[in-house]
């Protein structure tokens, strides 16, 4: 007899605090979902991959608990290209048509793209309304749904237009991971590995020994990976909600990764372009190699990180055809830079990272070229 996976809960102590609920069956929990709604209007935002599977269930559960609710569903095409100013405007128009007031609530049903767009829409409508993250990808469960960063992309860069706006709650129904494509599961595991790499050697070792169970979607292993990742992010975000200090460490691999994404073009369903988790995996290896070159991290730890990412089926080398100078141009636009100088999150070995200002571009160029 299979032991049921217990519900896990993680509190994020930002102003205001909120709770991350992690476990199976949460899309079928009317009291939990209804408790997040203060007013009479709600809008579910989802995408063309997720909505056919889960939007009707969320819609039904909400109306079962709140029959008086004015509730619509807005579905966007799947993929990073939907995280645009155009679709932000379309979501705002949906709220206007709904007649949403300041006590309305948005539900982000999907991955990081939907979560970011929904959060930014909530931050802007009437100067800020509630939204609930209902992540359906592993990457969104462990990273983008937690912390209150919201944004859309522009052609010049990823997440360039955004706001800090914490969700009212995060409700992560782990049953949705059963339908997640393997490539997307691996992308989420890239962000899970990041937490071990930057601050938890014990978790890093656990990921080395639990690979088969995680890739096989063992419910207990996945719940543990999600909960531990969320605990790490909640701990950091609770102390640094606006990324003025240590929260920047969560960006290990992201400066390189965002440059890869914007240079190659954003990944869409069926595309061979690297998705976010894959680009971060490559970025972590590049950051580790640069750290080794600068004398910050031991070479054997860099090799250990690369081997772990390889073992999970993640890419660890730059895609062919990306020019170092083009990538550097994108990196110069990164939000973490100071006074026009590169500021990168680099590595001190397994379990340790630091933000390094004024990184030598020649050293970065050499890493990108090799």
From Swiss-Prot:
- Tell me its cofactors: Co(2+); Zn(2+); NAD(+)
Which reaction(s) does the protein catalyse, per the Swiss-Prot or TrEMBL entry?
7-phospho-2-dehydro-3-deoxy-D-arabino-heptonate = 3-dehydroquinate + phosphate
PANTHER family from the UniProt entry: 3-DEHYDROQUINATE SYNTHASE, 3-DEHYDROQUINATE SYNTHASE, CHLOROPLASTIC
Q: List the disulfide bonds.
A: none
GO CC terms: cytoplasm
Q: Which CDD domains match?
A: DHQS (cd08195)
Pathway per the UniProt entry: Metabolic intermediate biosynthesis; chorismate biosynthesis; chorismate from D-erythrose 4-phosphate and phosphoenolpyruvate: step 2/7
Pfam family for this entry, one: DHQ_synthase
What protein family is recorded?
A: Belongs to the sugar phosphate cyclases superfamily. Dehydroquinate synthase family.
Keywords assigned: Amino-acid biosynthesis, Aromatic amino acid biosynthesis, Cobalt, Cytoplasm, Lyase, Metal-binding, NAD, Nucleotide-binding, Zinc
Report a single Gene Ontology molecular function: 3-dehydroquinate synthase activity
Enzyme Commission no: 4.2.3.4
Explain how, and how many, cofactor molecules are bound.
Binds 1 divalent metal cation per subunit. Can use either Co(2+) or Zn(2+).
Q: Which organism is it from?
A: Xylella fastidiosa (strain M12)
Q: Note the SUPFAM superfamilies from the entry.
A: Dehydroquinate synthase-like
Q: Which of this chain's residues are annotated to bind Zn(2+)?
A: 191, 254, 276
Which protein are we looking at?
3-dehydroquinate synthase
User: What InterPro entries does the record tag this protein with?
Assistant: Dehydroquinate_synthase (IPR050071), DHQ_synth_AroB (IPR016037), DHQ_synth_fam (IPR030963), DHQS/DOIS_N (IPR030960), DHQS_C (IPR056179)
């Amino acid at each position: 007899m299979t032991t049921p996976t217990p519900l896990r809960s993680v509190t994020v102590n930002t102003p205001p605090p909120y709770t991350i609920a992690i476990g199976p069956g949460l899309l079928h929990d009317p009291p939990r979902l209804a408790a997040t709604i203060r007013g009479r209007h709600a809008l579910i935002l989802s995408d063309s991959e997720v909505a056919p599977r889960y939007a009707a269930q969320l819609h039904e559960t909400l109306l079962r608990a709140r029959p008086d609710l004015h509730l619509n569903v807005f579905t966007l095409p799947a993929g990073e290209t939907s995280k645009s100013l155009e679709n932000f405007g379309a979501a705002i128009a949906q709220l206007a048509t709904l007649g949403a007031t300041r006590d309305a609530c948005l539900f982000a049903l999907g991955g990081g793209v939907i979560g970011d767009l929904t959060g930014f829409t909530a931050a802007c409508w009437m100067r800020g309304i509630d939204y609930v993250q209902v992540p359906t990808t592993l990457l969104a469960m462990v990273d983008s749904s937690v912390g209150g960063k919201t944004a859309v992309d522009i052609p010049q860069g990823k997440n360039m237009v955004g706001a800090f706006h914490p969700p009212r709650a995060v409700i992560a129904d782990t049953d949705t991971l059963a339908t997640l494509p393997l490539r997307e599961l691996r992308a989420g595991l890239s962000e899970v590995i990041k937490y071990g790499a930057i601050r938890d050697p014990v978790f890093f070792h656990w990921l080395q020994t639990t690979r088969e169970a995680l890739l096989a979607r063992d419910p207990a292993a996945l719940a543990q990976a999600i909960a531990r990742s969320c605990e790490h992010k909640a701990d950091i975000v609770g102390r640094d909600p606006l990324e003025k200090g240590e929260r920047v460490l969560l960006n290990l691999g992201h400066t390189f990764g965002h440059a890869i994404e914007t240079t190659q073009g954003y990944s869409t369903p069926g595309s061979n372009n690297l998705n976010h988790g894959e680009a971060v995996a490559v970025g972590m290896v590049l950051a580790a190699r640069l750290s080794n070159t600068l004398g910050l991290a031991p070479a054997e730890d860099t090799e250990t990180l690369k081997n772990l990412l390889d073992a999970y089926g993640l890419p660890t080398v730059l895609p062919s055809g990306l020019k170092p100078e083009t990538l550097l141009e994108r990196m110069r636009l990164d939000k973490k830079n100071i006074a026009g100088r590169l500021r990168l999150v680099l590595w001190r070995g397994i379990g340790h990272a630091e933000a390094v200002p004024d990184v030598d571009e020649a050293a970065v160029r050499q890493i990108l070229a090799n």
